[in-house]
Amino acid sequence: MIQSSQPMSLKLTCSAFRLQRALRFLLGRLPWRVASGARRFRRWLNRYSYTVLSSWPERALISLKNRSRFLVRPNTRNRAFSWTCRAARSKPRPRRSTALPRSQASSSRHSWAEFLKFRKSFQMSNTSQPDPSRPGTERTSSKEAGCRPLGQLDSFSWAARPPPGAAGLAVSEGFFRKIRSSAPSSPSFSRALMSNTYLCFLTTGPRSSRENTQKSFPATSPREPVTSRLRGKAPALSPSRELSFTSAPF
């Protein structure tokens, strides 16, 4: 009888080490080890799925899919079957959203991108454009001129240029402090203002401030009172009314 040179304890230790090495992602490991092992198995299955599943008969695949009903939930049945038995796509394509049709989704995405571009250009378009009729002032360009009320246009469209020197520095500090204090303090007001701006953008579209001001106001000086405009245009009386005034008895 031939006796082995290695003791039994060493043989058991080696076999246990081999078993633990073969199944290291399942025996006494942490959850991320199990997830890495599942990813390895899925990668191996995707690599050899064409050779393995092509040899399987169709009945075996159908029975495997039917048995998966008792193991997974109905809403995850197809996903689990695709993870285990379906082959990976050679050329994956981005999936479309099923919430909206493609035309409506693309149009809404395009309109939102246009609105964001319009908002960014509006924030960056406060460049000074001096008016030739008034050399002491400058006009700030605004693409929302057609959607603002009359009071906001009068208070935001014209700004006096501060004179140079220490007095001009004090005036500019007071001017910028007034601008900061006029900003909305509550988030609900700013959110409502943004929603109104977006609705105005959808209805009117991005137009230049010069076109909006020409449509909303006549081409006159902004400080000219309304009474002077009305004085220049006297109402013309018809000849019948003039005759009635002259022929009336006193």
From Swiss-Prot:
Residues 241-250 have a biased composition (Polar residues). InterPro entries: GDF5OS (IPR039711). Residues 86-108, 124-148, 204-250 are annotated as: Disordered. GO terms for cellular component: mitochondrion. Its main location: mitochondrion. Residues 136-146 have a biased composition (Basic and acidic residues). Residues 1-48 form a transit peptide. Keywords: Mitochondrion, Transit peptide. The keyword Mitochondrion applies. It is found in: Mitochondrion. The keyword Mitochondrion applies. PANTHER family: PROTEIN GDF5-AS1, MITOCHONDRIAL (PTHR42152:SF1), PROTEIN GDF5OS, MITOCHONDRIAL (PTHR42152). This is Protein GDF5-AS1, mitochondrial. The lineage of its organism: Eukaryota, Metazoa, Chordata, Craniata, Vertebrata.
